[in-house]
Amino acid sequence: MTAVVLDGVATASAVKSELAVRIRALREQGLVPGLGTLLVGDDPGSRAYVAGKHRDCAEVGIESIRVDLPADATEADVRLAIERLNSDPAVTGYIVQLPLPAGIDENAMLELIDPSKDADGLHPTNLGRLVLGVQGELTSPLPCTPAGIVEMLQRYEVPIAGQHVVVVGRGLTVGRPLGLLLTRKGLDATVTLTHSRTRDLEQEVRRADIVVAAVGVAHLIKPEWVKPGAAVLDVGITRVVDPETGKARLTGDVDPAVAEVAGHLSPNPRGVGPMTRAMLLANVVQAAERDARLAAELRG
């Protein structure tokens, strides 16, 4: 058996094409969606990540609002920048790029974000709505990586309802919110959330119809851990040194040999990562459409 590849690049491209149509409709109404980013410092990885987001915006027709602060910015500086993004009518949604410099309370800064402009879907208010809203349409933004995982599974027609999903990793950006999303009525998966203290992790993974590896341990998930035909999504990233070249490279949580056992496999890179970026754009478009509906209601 060779796994069907869950191609995140192709799937994200399809999502962005659909978003571009919706954005054109918004622009025809005089509403221009805008994504803001707040970057503090000169971390090369963060700069590259933010630049990628703005390239995505240009591709689909979303305006970019970029706020960069120096590495020696104070918490007061960051607070002021967030307040300005909250009040800027050109900003439909925005993100605060993490990590922030030492000495700045990240949680306190993130809680300052206007929940209606939370493009990452990770504000406590929006996560709380995900907890409470077990059925019906969610109008608040969803965490981007979990939403991207679900979108990709659905587009490849991988069954979710009634399936046993094992999530390896309990982080705020993937593991915990993914469990909440997959157990909503309408998706109806049964989710086991595992972590570093889970007893017999191998046995838990082997029971899964769908495995999501998001722990950041290189090649943790071995082929003998995976039930034949299971869908496996590789989310975690680890920087390792290539023994042949001596150069650092990025690798995922899933051993490449899993492709010979799994029914579906998302590669890493080119798997879930592009879908995360596409869902960020989707959150901005959804917020713009919400604003358009509110404006129409006010006009009567």
Curated annotation (Swiss-Prot):
The keyword Amino-acid biosynthesis applies. GO terms for biological process: L-histidine biosynthetic process; methionine biosynthetic process; purine nucleotide biosynthetic process; tetrahydrofolate interconversion. InterPro entries: Aminoacid_DH-like_N_sf, NAD(P)-bd_dom_sf, THF_DH/CycHdrlase, THF_DH/CycHdrlase_cat_dom, THF_DH/CycHdrlase_NAD-bd_dom. Pfam families: THF_DHG_CYH (PF00763), THF_DHG_CYH_C (PF02882). It comes from the Bacteria. NADP(+) binds at residues 169-171, 196, 237. GO terms for cellular component: cytosol. Pathway: One-carbon metabolism; tetrahydrofolate interconversion. This is Bifunctional protein FolD. The gene is folD.
